[in-house]
Amino acid sequence: KKNIWGDWIGKIGKLEMFFALCPILQGFNLGGFPLSLIVWILMLLVIFVRGYKIRLDTYKPLLMLAIYWLLHTIVVALQDNVNTNAMIAQVIYFLAIFSVYPLLNIEKLRRALNIVCIIVMAGLLYQWMEIMITGETHPLEIIGLQMSKERLETLSVRPSSFFMEPAAYAEFMLLPIALALMDKRIIWAIILILSVFFTSSTTGIVTCFLMLGAWTFMQKKRKALIVIPLIAIGLIYALNHFSVFEVGVDKLNNTDVETNVRLTQGEYVVGTMEGAEYIFGVPYSSAYNYCKSGRATNVIYYGEAVYMPTFWNLILLYGLVGLFLYLMTLFNLLKICKQLFPLITSLIITMYSGGMGLTSSFVYCMIFMLVVGTDYSKNQICSKKHLK
């Protein structure tokens, strides 16, 4: 007999589905081990078992960033205590990018992402109904897994589905929204954007409008230049006239740029660096170690961590050289596929408020952009230049 379910899963792609689920899974632990690392180890094991080779010469800007990180870490290890586990994890992250992206099929990935989007939006709807009934909601959990860190609020009036916080949900949705815009599936993109508005994530709301603006800027057809601004106006109207979005709008209006820790703490810490350190970074392995040494005393600690946005954290730990290589890794993707402009623009802007850095979220985004960019390049939808 024909295995119908097997054929259906095959059309999606098991590897692609697992990859699409990574942003959800990496927020949990399995038996005390963080899935943010385990998911990439599992994918590497699958690749090695299948006999695929790692293509280190595939995307040179990323390879240069990886080499700089390794040399920099070795030098810092001679002067400060380096977390060995974190160092091994970072090596695995870089290996995962080089190994995974050549194996993913864009069509199967698109289907897998759409299915995961439907699942997380269903979770969002469930939480929203719970808020309507009880006035608050619990974070959704996955049976057999534990949350990797305690949430600041066990109960919340802001839904986030299976993610740790609304900002994490918004970060995940950036990629499907970008893909929907690239495919000109405007209705699907609007649905995804509205789901981000449901979370009341300030970063998510701002980023969605940035992506729409960047995508409109790229359009040459007069119809698109008229339709997209109308959609943006409609979204703004929805934000201001529907009570379901009230929390997000209030949060956006009440955000004090001058006092918000997420926006100001990084600038303060970097301001305590000495002249020569701006080139290659400070001789400390983390912002926490740097601040605890007495170099920056007026900071707020989150356990054994100091929150700093990606932009400032890169300057602190890796200097302007590291920041330059990081940005070139993103900018050079535009040579492969100009249609990635809205997504890359959003990622660069959120560097001032988000903490993606070189984490597992960076791995996920890079793999996605390389898969999409390479496919569009091959089909001559984007630039005809291939990876060098």
Which role fits each region the language model picked out?
Residues W40-L44, P342-M351, G357-K388:
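Transmembrane alpha-helices of multi-pass inner-membrane enzymes
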Residues P61-L70, D80-L103:
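Aromatic-anchored transmembrane helix interface
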Residues I131, T216-T255:
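A membrane-periplasm/extracellular boundary helix in multi-pass inner-membrane enzymes
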Residues M132-R158, Y288-F311:
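Interfacial juxtamembrane loops and adjacent helix segments
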Residues K251-Y318:
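Long extracytoplasmic/lumenal interhelical loops at the membrane interface
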